[in-house]
């Protein structure tokens, strides 16, 4: 009987291409030849091609879930029964079990992770989970030991096949506590940007990366008046003009951004007084222009759920075919619950919840973002 380790390369490649993404690390540790094979471009293309075919056939989304300071890969299929619609693929462990991840951002298959140690010192690491490649970024916290900075990951598209990846980091609390810097992956260097915005991005607002640029919900610098989108253009290395939202939220409303197929933006609004939730999707989104679909994607009365999604922490994604939204939050029976939940809400207002388990910290919320594996090396 032929052992797996003795198979010809083409046959071994065909067999190993069926291995899940989170099992690749074990494959690479099993056999030296498999390690070499699995790190080749030919295998990677076949492997990711097979995974994409399976996902399309099963109507699955591949997502990254940050929960309890760890990063997981999950597959979501809202066409399945509620018990099996969210399937954990496994923990992405290239950073090591001793590393606590407090923030994660996705762009083009790369993850930008902000980590913390026992003394609350923050560190920045760029990570390609597919290759298991990491780069720790040297940085300084000029204003406070705790990391109160806002981060974004994007790229400058030099040609059809060449992309230059960059990291934006800023803090903007006051004229004496303001700093905007950009890090170039290729040159391994930081550069200070001259930015004096007339708007403000609250520190808890998460940006969404789309086509190499990052979008945030922003507001007037003074007071809580008009709300809008702002985009950081990584090619020009500057913020672009304000972009309109399809609706204006009140101060205590929940507002959150998400990407759709890596092509469009979606925004979730939930009114704090009526609990009505609306989701709108763009038909065009560029750094200096946005068009919103004239018809709301989903508008439902959430009184039956009897709570408002977390203003500062909720993350979500939509399934266009089934017209549902999946929101990741906490259980709402208590003021500060220790159970993580995923809420699946349909266009008719019906909803179901998936229990994601007990949380180690009742004040740390689950975070989900889209994920498409990448062959990029840095």
From Swiss-Prot:
Domain of life: Eukaryota
Residues spanning the membrane: none
SUPFAM superfamilies: F-box domain (SSF81383), Galactose oxidase, central domain (SSF50965)
Family matches, as Pfam families: F-box, FBA_1
InterPro entries according to UniProt: A_thaliana_F-box, F-box-assoc_dom_typ1, F-box-assoc_interact_dom, F-box-like_dom_sf, F-box_dom, Gal_Oxase/kelch_b-propeller
UniProt domain F-box: residue ranges: 1-47
Protein name per Swiss-Prot or TrEMBL: Putative F-box protein At3g24580
Originating organism: Arabidopsis thaliana (Mouse-ear cress)
Source species taxonomy: Eukaryota, Viridiplantae, Streptophyta, Embryophyta, Tracheophyta
